[in-house]
Amino acid sequence: TGVNSAINSGASSMPVIRGLSDDRIKIKIDGMDLISACANHMNSPLSSIDSSNIQQIKVFAGLTPVSMGGDSIGGSVVINSMQPDFAKSDEKIFKHKISTFYTTNNKASRVNISSSIASNKLSFNYNGSYIDAKNFKAGKHFKDSRLSATGRQFIDGDEVGSSAFKDGNHMITLGSRKDNQLINIKL
C-alpha cells in the first residue's frame, strides 16, 4: 500500500513510497546501500541489478528497522539477488535459460541469459541481460521535424529525442558450501 514507481529512464524506475522517492528512500541490494548512478538521478540504484536476477524484495514503508539500515524518512527497499544453485548429493546441475523480447514503438530488443553449473559443493552461475532501444514515438506530431541538437541525426515530429538507450547487467556468482557454511562471491 502506498508503493509505486516513477519511470525516469528506460533502464529502471525510481521507487516511490507514500509520495517520497529518490534519496528519501534507502535502497539496499545484497546488503549494500546504493544511491543514484548519476548526478541528475536518471538511473536509480535499481538500475544496478536486472529484474531477472532478483530472488527477494522487501519494502518497508515509513520508518525502517535499524537492522535494515534505519536512516530513511520515506522507507526502504531491500533486494536480495539470486543465490547459487547446488546439486543434491553426487548429481551435477547444468541449467541454461535464454529469454528475449521486442517492442515496436522504440524498436527495443532485449535478451536475458542465465546459466548454472554446479555440484553439491561448488556452483558457478552467470546472469546477464542487454537491451538496446531507439527513440520512442509519441501518439502524434508534437513538434516540427528537425536535426538533433548535435546535428548528427534527423528527428521526426512524433519522435521523442534523447529517449534511446542501451543497458547491460552481468553478474557472476561463485559459491562453495560445506556442512552448514556457504561462501559466496558475486562479481
Language model regions located:
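Extracytoplasmic beta-strand/coil segments of soluble accessory domains associated
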Residues: 1-33
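Transmembrane beta-barrel outer-membrane domains
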Residues: 8, 47, 52, 91, ...
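N-terminal periplasmic accessory domains that precede
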Residues: 13-16, 28, 44-47, 59, ...
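Structural signature of outer-membrane beta-barrel domains
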Residues: 22, 34, 82, 103-105, ...
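Short acidic/polar hinge/loop motifs at secondary-structure boundaries
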Residues: 34-63
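Extracellular loop and loop/strand-boundary signature of outer-membrane beta-barrel proteins
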Residues: 41, 99-100, 155-160
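Outer-membrane beta-barrel pore domains and translocons
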Residues: 62, 80, 99-105, 118, ...
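Periplasmic-side early beta-strands and strand-to-turn transitions of outer-membrane beta-barrels
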Residues: 93, 110, 114-187
